């Protein structure tokens, strides 16, 4: 049985934007030390389809706990998941739209932020907010046209600082929410 296959490879590229955070007006620089911390244990919930995510359930059953450090000027109640997200950062949205135009991509008519489940504790809410901005773009590299399937705008995760012997993970919230 001989079949002819062609190699195809994809790459996902992330670029932090030099703006305020995506859903609040906090600065987006990283700090060297955290001031204060709080503990959280994330629990799995039933989806709108009536099912519990198996990965979230397995992480919960490990009895893992998460401790989060705050940083002055880079953390507010939005990162702590104690306040709803504010309106999307217009500078970050404009950068994503401009980049999409530069790629000749098809910008989505109505942009909505989706919630992707995150079970490792790197987001205090248990999910990451991501928006599909555009599809079907391309970039010319020499004599080749490289397809760009999608452009998304999303918030970055918290930084893992350490893991204790008890499987408790310490995250710093300065990076959480950077577009």
Residues of each region from the PLM?
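Basic, nucleic-acid-interacting segments
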Residues: 1-179
